[in-house]
């Protein structure tokens, strides 16, 4: 039976690797009674290369570090002004399939942007969310022991130039776009507050409990 309470952890700006390892630890040590959590964070500039990633898609990283990680997908960029959301969910307990989870995440972004009269959409062959063929949100998950970690990155108000140093998600010439220039949420906090609402509704959570920072380990 699904626990209808979702714990939201607001992490502020945090180093990518420390949050990644904390996600792994939470997933590896959780049990059937562990709560589902949503981690809201921004990262300093970093490229992350997913398990399907190919080195030729990293064109010119320059001074931005490249980290090989254990999520699905290919290379992407994280940086200040981008909303990153990590759903740490027991999908086995809640009886949500992986494809259904991906669809819910994409739809939550689409629904949130629709509140700003932005017509966004998903693509069956290229996970993420798009507006006029430009990508506004990237998606990469990992499922372990029936539980999800990693998640989504929504471009809000950031420097998009580093995306030109890679082939985003393995697509040469893929153009990125962000919420601010589309007339969407203007800050990461605003985007996070709105996305929490749409995502929790789609996933069936009825009570949200907010926390600042990670739980003491």
From Swiss-Prot:
Keyword check for Acetylation: no
Keywords: Acyltransferase, Cytoplasm, Transferase
Active site residues according to the UniProt entry: 169 (acyl-thioester intermediate)
Subcellular localization, as worded in the UniProt entry: Cytoplasm
Cited CDD domains: LipB
Biological or metabolic pathway of the protein: Protein modification; protein lipoylation via endogenous pathway; protein N(6)-(lipoyl)lysine from octanoyl-[acyl-carrier-protein]: step 1/2
Keyword Secreted among UniProt keywords: no
BPL/LPL catalytic domain location: 32-207
Principal subcellular localisation of the protein: cytoplasm
Enzyme Commission designation: 2.3.1.181
MF-aspect GO terms: lipoyl(octanoyl) transferase activity
Annotated catalysed reactions: octanoyl-[ACP] + L-lysyl-[protein] = N(6)-octanoyl-L-lysyl-[protein] + holo-[ACP] + H(+)
Site (Lowers pKa of active site Cys): residue numbering on this chain: 135
GO BP terms in the entry: protein modification process
One Gene Ontology term, aspect cellular component: cytoplasm
Binding-site positions, substrate: 71-78, 138-140, 151-153
Similarity comment: family membership: Belongs to the LipB family.
Described purpose of this protein according to its UniProt entry: Catalyzes the transfer of endogenously produced octanoic acid from octanoyl-acyl-carrier-protein onto the lipoyl domains of lipoate-dependent enzymes. Lipoyl-ACP can also act as a substrate although octanoyl-ACP is likely to be the physiological substrate.
More info: In the reaction, the free carboxyl group of octanoic acid is attached via an amide linkage to the epsilon-amino group of a specific lysine residue of lipoyl domains of lipoate-dependent enzymes.
Stored PANTHER family: LIPOYLTRANSFERASE 2, MITOCHONDRIAL-RELATED, OCTANOYLTRANSFERASE
Protein name: Octanoyltransferase
Organism of origin: Shewanella sp. (strain ANA-3)
